[in-house]
């Protein structure tokens, strides 16, 4: 609309200059015609000019309205439909994908279905194997399950002696206590201990004491039947444990750990 108005204004200015030159030349012609200036009316050129301007304005308005109707203004057709009717030459469409592929040979459809079905079956089989392999790798192996629990025969352990076995990579002390050892363990004032525990809490059978042979200070292995209290002594930093595995002296903060165990038979012990 603005472009049309600009073009029309430019044409009107040209026509106005032409009309002005025409009127001026006519005025000069009248003045040069030898007639008396008083006999010729002075308002004639201005009347011609005003009428000419009015005709130009009417023509301009009619042409603008006609142009507006041509580009879709004031028409009943939507702008989108009008744009489709008058496409722009700058819009370029890619027609390379408008070609239709030729239909395949009907006799080869069975082969294509067979190939697709076979590929899907192979893919499903490989996926199943991968899932099974992942599940099996997450489960514990037989060696790990065997190390998770340890069965110990207690028949060969003499009273007053300590046996060391390996369980989950750690030493485990199994001590068969005598009657004097049991009395000594129960005679201790629990309130004076650094890590107070009753002896009955640490054993299931008073005759057998089972503890993990790792010092609770820095992980050294204490020596059995040593120390000031007849239990275990850690040579690394001088921690002393009594006959129940409780810390009595030295830098160790806690008692020796008691693992999970149970008695299968009278002389069978299962650790873990």
UniProtKB/Swiss-Prot annotation:
* CDD domains on file: Rieske_cytochrome_bc1
Query: What residue ranges lie in the Mitochondrial matrix compartment?
Result: 61-109
Q: Which residues form the Rieske domain?
A: 201-270
Presequence range in chain numbering:
1-60
Going by the UniProt record, its keywords in alphabetical order are: 2Fe-2S, Disulfide bond, Electron transport, Iron, Iron-sulfur, Membrane, Metal-binding, Mitochondrion, Mitochondrion inner membrane, Respiratory chain, Transit peptide, Translocase, Transmembrane, Transmembrane helix, Transport
Task: Give the InterPro entries listed for this entry.
Answer: Rieske_2Fe-2S, Rieske_2Fe-2S_sf, Rieske_Fe-S_prot, Rieske_Fe-S_prot_C, Rieske_TM, Ubiquinol_cyt_c_Rdtase_Fe-S-su
Task: Provide the residue span(s) of the region labelled Disordered.
Answer: 27-46
Cellular component terms per the entry's GO annotation: mitochondrial inner membrane; mitochondrial membrane; mitochondrion; plastid; respiratory chain complex III
Query: What is this enzyme's class at the first EC digit?
Result: translocase
Residues annotated for [2Fe-2S] cluster binding in this entry: 215, 217, 234, 237
Q: Which Pfam families match?
A: Rieske (PF00355), UCR_TM (PF02921)
Q: Which residues cross the membrane?
A: 110-132
Q: What is its EC number?
A: 7.1.1.8
Compartments (UniProt record): Mitochondrion inner membrane
Q: Which cofactor does it need?
A: [2Fe-2S] cluster
Mitochondrial intermembrane face residues:
133-272
Mind telling me which SUPFAM superfamilies this protein's record contains? ISP domain, ISP transmembrane anchor
Annotated membrane topology is: Single-pass membrane protein
Q: Listed disulfide bonds for this chain?
A: 220-236
Q: What else is known?
A: The Rieske protein is a high potential 2Fe-2S protein.
**So what does this one do?**
Component of the ubiquinol-cytochrome c oxidoreductase, a multisubunit transmembrane complex that is part of the mitochondrial electron transport chain which drives oxidative phosphorylation.
Record family assignment:
Belongs to the Rieske iron-sulfur protein family.
Name the chain's protein: Cytochrome b-c1 complex subunit Rieske-1, mitochondrial
